[in-house]
Amino acid sequence: MDPAYETVDELIDLGTRVGTVKDGKLSCNSGDEYDNVSGAVSGLLNFYEFSGFANVTWRHLIMVLVGLIFIFLAIRYDFEPLLLIPIGFGILIGNIPMFQAVDFNLKLGIYEPGSVLNILYQGVVQGWYPPLIFLGIGAMTDFSSLISNPKLMLLGAAAQVGIFLTFLGALFFGFLPPEAGAIAIIGGADGPTAIFISSKLANGLNVMPNGEVVKNLIGPIAIAAYSYMALVPVIQPPVIKLLTSKKERQRRMKPPRAVSKLEKILFPIVGLLLTAYIAPSALPLLGMLFFGNLLKESGVTKRLANTASNALIDVITMLLGITVGASTQADVFLTPSSIQIFILGAASFVIATAGGVMGAKLMNVFLKKENKINPMIGAAGVSAVPDSARVVQHMGLQEDPSNHLLMHAMAPNVSGVIGSAVAAGILLSFLM
């Protein structure tokens, strides 16, 4: 029986109007129809609850904007596109808000055990990706300029001063020693090294003797390191000009000598033994770097060298970029600690650049006139390969169109790669 009402009342279930109006009276639908409508509305509400629109916050929107800026800078201004596009897109993926419940796991997010992103992210957390990237770097790096002028290795070491000074600065900001060590490595401008050391020291799992848990800073540190790597052409020139005169920037250097094949083969072997004995904790990075270089220089493993320097490093770079980007979820990334990390990272990068330049000027005090070096190449001791060397080359051509410094600058540049890995190993040995 359909009951009738003299007035039109609304029968609402889950926000849905139920019934039909006829001749000024409201009649209810049958029970089946009521259940169908109720079920449909309930389904729509469930759908809405699971959508990103129901769970989005202003923090998510800010991070989406950051991801879009990364992608824009990579495409529009060619700022490290191989890094910033995967990271930027990963930030977009990581900041799609999803339904959260204690007893409900969709296995979609990067921090949800068993999800695809979480499995891929283990390459970052467990420190698998950085050594594989070092393998590719070694397979594509020519150490001839460093072998021909070994004293320039000191410039790569001088640039690491930014790491240790920033370590003290991070302690002053109130970070725990392991966190400070992970933040300090940003000054090396070496993304893989920064990720490797932060996965060991600032992974959110380590516990201090007083019971305090170390924060998970992998995402902020990685984003800061790669951001400053992309901004090398913006950050370094003002620092170099501030610390050098026009005459110094115009200084010419003797052409590097020719390097024999035997020297090229011996270098990765001797280099591994020397550096790994100094900093055994950096063996995963140094071992893969020199192994990749031996593949290149031996002349009998070209296929392996080509795979390491092309397909392998490209795949790992994509996985590393997209997982690091996805790990920067709004609730994890937008914290006061992240702002402090970016400030310390910028300071570390500037100090490293200045340390390399001042180290070159100090070396000139002890060198004969014909052997003096252009102090600008000291800035290439920052291990953003080959961007720092290109900055020096560009500035040299601006001062003197016939003065080519690229090959000279590559010596401290590749030395900086080794130096940052050694510095990371030293920090690990003190802080683990």
Question: How would you name each of these model-derived features?
Answer:
Residues 272-360:
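Transmembrane helical segments that form the transport core of multi-pass membrane transport proteins
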Residues 1-31, 37-38:
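Conserved N-terminal/central alpha/beta ligand/cofactor-binding core
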